[in-house]
A protein has these predicted regions:
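Hydrophobic alpha-helical connector segments
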Residues: 82, 96-125, 176
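Helix-turn-helix
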Residues: 33-36, 40-78, 82
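Conserved hydrophobic residue
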Residues: 50-51, 165, 169
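Hydrophobic alpha-helical segments that form the core
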Residues: 3-4, 170-189, 201-213
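N-terminal intrinsically disordered/low-complexity leader segments
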Residues: 1-32
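Amphipathic alpha-helical packing segments from all-alpha helical-bundle domains
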Residues: 89-92, 140-166, 174-178
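Short, hydrophobic secondary-structure boundary micro-motifs
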Residues: 128-131, 172
């Protein structure tokens, strides 16, 4: 064996990166960049609307070069889907946990209202995007989002149905569910923590209004 070959064998020689998935640090950087793009899209869609925002603006806001942007996202519609999916799945997970909890229907409704107030206060931008631009999704994505939204509403409906059957509530009509969700969803329009509005106080007021009208 020559001296060069021996040295190469001893030191392991020049290493080559195996093909396939990138190293963890590179993959982590890619995930962080994608999150930055999504966060920028949330801010811009909420401020300017989905149709009023260009992909180039999102890239500039996220500090991502135009050539690299499409490595992380396929389209502006994909960003809209990701924003609305995340928010709605979060709402569904919380609603399902409350619906299946060992609580009576009155306490479940109280918990649902409180939880919904909290997530809307935390995700006002996503809610505004859903209300204003949700119908910009079409085809499969629109259908998938509607399934998630229907599941959230079904959780509320089950709580009211159980309460009505147990004699706790005066009504379990679907219009009541729509009214409750509408009341809470519109929070994004006027909630301003800088004015002293608190999530706890708003949730308490909403619960009082709902239960005063529903509880026998």
């Amino acid at each position: 064996m020559s001296g060069r070959a021996a040295a190469s064998a001893t030191l392991g020689g020049p290493s080559r990166r195996p093909r396939g998935r990138p190293p963890g640090s590179v993959a982590g950087q890619g995930a962080a960049t994608r999150e930055r793009i999504i966060e920028s899209a949330v801010e811009l869609f909420a401020a300017k609307g989905f149709h009023g925002t260009s992909v180039a603006e999102i890239g500039t806001h996220a500090d991502v070069q135009p050539g690299a942007l499409y490595y992380h996202i396929r389209s502006k519609h994909e960003l809209l889907w990701e924003i609305l999916r995340r928010y709605t799945e979060h709402a569904l997970q919380g609603a399902e946990a409350i619906t299946t909890a060992d609580l009576n229907p009155v306490d479940k409704l109280r918990e649902l209202i409180g939880f919904h107030v909290r997530i809307i206060a935390e995700h006002r931008q996503a809610v505004s995007i859903q209300v204003r631009d949700g119908d910009s999704l079409t085809g499969t994505r629109a259908a998938e989002l509607q399934v998630l939204r229907d599941k959230v509403q079904d959780c509320w409906q089950r709580v009211l149905d159980d309460g009505y059957q147990a004699g706790c509530f005066r009504s379990a009509d679907r219009a009541v569910v729509n009214g409750l969700l509408g009341m809470v969803n519109m929070l994004y329009l006027w909630y301003r923590p800088e004015r002293g509005d608190t999530v706890e106080a708003i949730a308490e007021q909403f619960c009082a209004m709902a239960l005063d009208g529903l509880v026998r």
